[in-house]
Curated annotation (Swiss-Prot):
Keywords: Cell membrane, Lipoprotein, Membrane, Palmitate, Signal. Residues 1-29 form the signal peptide. It is a lipid-anchor. This is Putative lipoprotein LpqE. A lipid is attached at residue 30 (S-diacylglycerol cysteine). It comes from the Bacteria. The lineage of its organism: Bacteria, Bacillati, Actinomycetota, Actinomycetes, Mycobacteriales. A lipid is attached at residue 30 (N-palmitoyl cysteine). It is found in: Cell membrane. It comes from Mycobacterium tuberculosis (strain ATCC 25618 / H37Rv). One of its GO terms (cellular component) is peptidoglycan-based cell wall. The keyword Iron does not apply. Its main location: membrane.
Length: 182
């Protein structure tokens, strides 16, 4: 082999290696700056969510069965949610809930311990409210409707806590339990 032939082979090899490196860099950089599909997933629950300072409200929903076009005024429906206190040392208390669709009555122990949870209402299909066995005391929130409501729509609710303050969120009607197919 002569020197010319060796130089051509080296040049061809260098070009080939450089093009492979460029291709690898281009392929690995294609996803740069993009948000992955799993980065912002929301929980698969019926209700909405709200954060008021250190208090997180999760799976907020109206629990009612709609048998006609609307759930009529005068009927009482339950409001179900889970409140989580992220403060490690400050307890809080649910002072009240207001809504445009009716008056909301909160009964039971509405205290929210530091780093603890408060269950409001009993979800469909459960006999007792979820929570630790020694202190299985959930509060109950009942909405006495003054306006008709319907599935598929959301309704404004304002939650007021003693220390965290207040916040508003649009709340849906729960889809409820599915009836078994026969």
């Amino acid at each position: 082999m002569n020197r010319c032939n060796i130089r051509l082979r080296l040049a061809g090899m260098t070009t080939w290696v450089a093009s492979i490196a460029l291709l690898a860099a281009a392929l690995s950089g294609c996803g740069a700056g993009q948000i992955s599909q799993t980065a912002n997933q929301k929980p698969a629950v019926n209700g909405n969510r709200l954060t008021i300072n250190n208090v997180l409200l999760r799976d907020i929903r109206i629990q009612a069965v709609q048998t006609s076009d609307f759930i009529q005024p005068g009927k009482a429906v339950d409001l179900v949610l889970v409140a989580v206190n992220q403060s490690p040392d400050v307890s809080d208390r649910l002072v009240g809930i207001t809504s445009d669709i009716g008056s909301v009555t909160v009964a039971g122990d509405a205290r929210l311990p530091a780093s603890g949870m408060l269950f409001v209402g009993t979800p469909d299909g459960q006999i007792v409210a979820p929570g630790p066995l020694p202190s299985n005391q959930a509060a109950k929130a009942t909405v006495n409707l003054t306006k008709p409501i319907a599935n598929g729509l959301t309704y404004n609710f304002t939650f007021k806590f003693e220390k965290a303050g207040q916040g508003s969120v649009m709340v849906p009607i729960s889809a409820g339990l599915a009836t078994p197919h026969e």
